[in-house]
Regions:
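Hydrophobic h-region of N-terminal signal peptides that target proteins for export
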Residues: 14-22
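Beta-rich carbohydrate-recognition modules and glycan-binding surfaces
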Residues: 2, 22-186
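N-terminal processing/targeting junctions
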Residues: 13-14, 39
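Bacterial N-terminal signal peptides that target proteins for export
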Residues: 1-12
Length: 186
């Protein structure tokens, strides 16, 4: 007698292979840029707070991605610009931040704060290549800094964050442009 029923594994595996995978659904979204994005909780912080002349901007591209762009100046002892996003985010069950970015072959910093009372941030540098990439940053690899100086404290081990930022400050005068699709936890 001919067996017309295939084992289930021979049916499910090929079907799963052709299902669309939405990488954005993996983990917890912190911010997903799109054409309707609001920048209500975003702020630009330049070296102008100390007399510098750098200028950063945040905008939305036609494709819906965010664009952090501008110019870093070393005049008047400056040399950085940043964009910051304020939101209380629980990190329970997650140990990485994923940045989906398209860069300009420059180094940037991801910066987080776990409390509004903290003067320091936890920082991790990353290289943004000129192609879309998922930058995966373990939270435990983020080191404490204050005004660019390392602190003698433990790396990040918090349960939440209240602020997330991107900063460029490579000690050279330069234009920059970093496209951001989304920021999520994994």
């Amino acid at each position: 007698m001919l067996n017309l029923f295939l084992p289930l594994k021979y049916i499910i595996v090929p079907v799963l292979f052709f299902l669309p995978i939405n990488i954005k659904s993996e983990g917890k979204m912190i911010y997903d840029f799109n054409v309707d994005s609001s920048f209500r909780n975003w702020a630009i912080v330049d070296d102008g707070v100390m007399g510098g002349l750098s200028a950063g901007n945040l905008g939305i591209q036609k494709d819906g991605s965010g664009l952090f762009y501008g110019y870093v100046s070393l005049d008047n002892y400056g040399g950085f610009t940043s964009v910051r996003f304020r939101k209380n985010v629980s990190l329970k069950g997650f140990d990485k931040i994923i940045l989906r970015v398209l860069g300009d072959n420059k180094f940037y910093q991801l910066r987080i704060r776990s409390s509004y009372q903290d003067r320091h941030s936890y920082v991790k540098s990353f290289y943004a290549a000129d192609e879309w990439s998922d930058i995966e940053i373990p939270l435990s690899s983020m080191e404490p800094q204050f005004r660019g100086r390392s602190l003698r404290m433990k790396n990040f081990n918090g349960n939440s964050l209240v602020e997330l930022g991107l900063l460029i400050g490579n000690k050279v005068e330069e234009s920059f442009a970093l496209k951001i699709d989304h920021i999520r936890l994994k």
